[in-house]
């Protein structure tokens, strides 16, 4: 168990827009992009053959699209991120409204085979005794409703243009 619940910089959601594409490009997980979104597969390929395929086919397309997007401005990068009060209840993670303490969402995560761990096991139980000063900084209504931990979330989008361009 953690020695204390980490205090987030804020509760709720924030949005960042107008991000610099050149900066963002450095953080793209290209392997996930090429395999998960673009459909490239390493199946049956050696490490060297896979690398050659990526360098010959995928990377030039990525660089061309990045250059076009920067010149034409058709990508609209946006990041939504936030922190929410949460608590574990049985096999579910409850997400509370920072303003009202109402349960906004319940998430059920799979458990590892053989009764192993689940992501929910890493969160504090509902109405657990505080580990530190979280009763002082946790949103009051959420704390009263049993929130004893914090969940950080993020969502990244590039807008609708990439899908339209890919289908063209």
Predicted regions mapped to residue ranges:
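Active-site loops and adjacent core secondary-structure elements that bind or stabilize anionic groups
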Residues: 1-168
